[in-house]
Structure formats: structure tokens, C-alpha cells
Amino acid sequence: MTDSTQTPDIPLLDAVQARLLGCLVEKEATTPDTYPLTVNAAQSAANQKTAREPVMNIDAGGVQHALRQLETLGLARQHFSSRADRYEHRLQAALDLTRQQTVLLAQLLLRGPQTLGELVTRSERLHRFADADEARHAIERLQQRALLVVLPRASGQREDRYMHLLCGEVDGAALAAKYASSGGGSEAADPGLAERVAQLEAAVAELQAQLAELRG
């Protein structure tokens, strides 16, 4: 992050654009050999059944349209090639973020509201935080820039949850209530085990994305 006092404008994304942007950040770290992503690989990443909330089913045309919109917003860049066009994210550069802030935003783009502990654990393949304080500091900086908000706690919740604001203002009370009514998601019983399973399933999804890449 630079020392410039001029704060970049914050773009307003729709749900598909947000999902694709999060995928580009994620795959830059987890599948560097096939990054930047083709439209097919980006579609596979966006429609993963694991490590995504909500699960989406975006067709190739919708993916390509969203990627082009991200490029117009300065959040992605297209690379032309003889075989297939590819896309890379520019989230960190466009919004003048640190690596830590970029990774945290990506997790929120991909999986919605999360606690500090969930963000630290789920970010390990993208950036290994030294401790919770490092992540907390990055969250505070994002909050100061109105890129992130702390959600009100619903009944029975013991930890704060955070949500990005790249899709505009959120109904914090409704999101908190939705999370509480779901029992905290599938991770509530054993978050460590659930996360390891999610990582294995994500690895399978990445292999599928690589196959899609080879097919064109």
C-alpha cells in the first residue's frame, strides 16, 4: 500500500462480479501454473461446490460478461493469446491494498460473513497470517476505508462477523439472523475438520479447473 493520501474510488459490484473477483485472487495463489484464468477456468472456480457461499451456477456467457465488467472497473486485466483469453485481478493495485487486506476481502467475496478465526484459517493457502492480531489490524484498516463492516451479533453468537462492502451497504441484522438460524453453517460442530475437508474438495475443484484449461 502506498503513502498517497488520495483514496481510490470504491467500485460497486454485483454478486457475479464479486464472485469472479474473489476467484481471481484465490487462484492466483492456489493455481499459479494456470493463472491468469481462462473463461472456462474462471467458470469452474466460480461454480465450486465447496468454499463458496452461496453456491452459484453461472454460465460461460455470464462469466465472460462479468470479467469484462471487472476490466472496465479497473479490477481485472485481460491477456490476449492465440488459444484463449485470460484474466488476472487488479484488486490490490486498484484499491491500493496490502496483500493481507486483499486476501481478507477475497475470502469475504467468496464465502460471505465470517469471524476473525474463520478468516485466518481459510486464508492459509493465500497468505499465512503470523497471528490473529495481524489479521485484526488488516480488518481494522479495511473498516476505516469503508470496505468492510462488523455485523451485529445475533442471539447466541459469541464472536463478531465481518462482511465486505464491495456490493454496497448490507443489512447486518438480517445477515446475522440468517447465520444464526443456520446454526453457524456446517463448520459449527468441528470447524477444523470441516475446513480440512473443504480444502481437499477445493483441491479437486482446482484439478477440474486445470482440465477445463487443457480443453481450451
UniProtKB/Swiss-Prot annotation:
Q: Which HAMAP family match?
A: UPF0502
Output the PANTHER family linked to this UniProt entry.
UPF0502 PROTEIN YCEH
Record-stated family: Belongs to the UPF0502 family.
Q: What is this protein called?
A: UPF0502 protein Smal_0052
This chain's source organism reads Stenotrophomonas maltophilia (strain R551-3)
Query: Taxonomy-wise, where does this protein's organism fall, top ranks first?
Result: Bacteria, Pseudomonadati, Pseudomonadota, Gammaproteobacteria, Lysobacterales
